[in-house]
């Protein structure tokens, strides 16, 4: 059961990332490449000027990718803390004399609850990221 929840959570994250890539990141990549091409077409610019121009073109995309990566890391860390809390509770129950089957059931229930709670965070995280990416694309 916990594995099923984990798969649902992973699929939801994958869907979110694909949506962000398709609707936001890809457009920013196109702008970055067109901007970089314009830099290269400036025959009067020095090699260093062209390089700086290309770097400026790449900055919004790099910031957007960093934003998504950081948000996903925060989400993953929160989920890991939640499951560690479940493990700690299970160990405490086992140490206090609870039967192994009871502890396993408690652990699985706790982990499923973590997954469900974090599944509920995905829509707001998606909106937050889409809003931030739209702002970065201006």
UniProtKB/Swiss-Prot annotation:
InterPro entries: DUF842_euk. Pfam families: DUF842. PANTHER family: PROTEIN FAM136A. Belongs to the FAM136 family. This is Protein FAM136A. It comes from Xenopus tropicalis (Western clawed frog).
């Amino acid at each position: 059961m916990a594995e099923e929840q984990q798969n649902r959570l992973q699929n939801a994250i994958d869907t979110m990332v694909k949506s962000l890539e398709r609707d936001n990141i890809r457009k920013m990549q196109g702008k970055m490449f067109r901007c970089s091409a314009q830099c290269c077409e400036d025959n009067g610019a020095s090699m260093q000027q062209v390089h700086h121009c290309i770097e400026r073109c790449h900055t919004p995309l790099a910031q957007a990718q960093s934003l998504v990566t950081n948000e996903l890391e925060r989400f993953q860390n929160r989920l890991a803390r939640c499951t560690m809390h479940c493990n700690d509770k299970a160990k405490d129950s086992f140490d206090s004399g609870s039967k192994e089957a009871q502890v396993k059931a408690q652990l699985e229930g706790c982990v499923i609850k973590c997954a469900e709670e974090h599944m509920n965070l995905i829509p707001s995280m998606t909106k937050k990221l889409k809003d931030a990416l739209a702002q970065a694309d201006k």
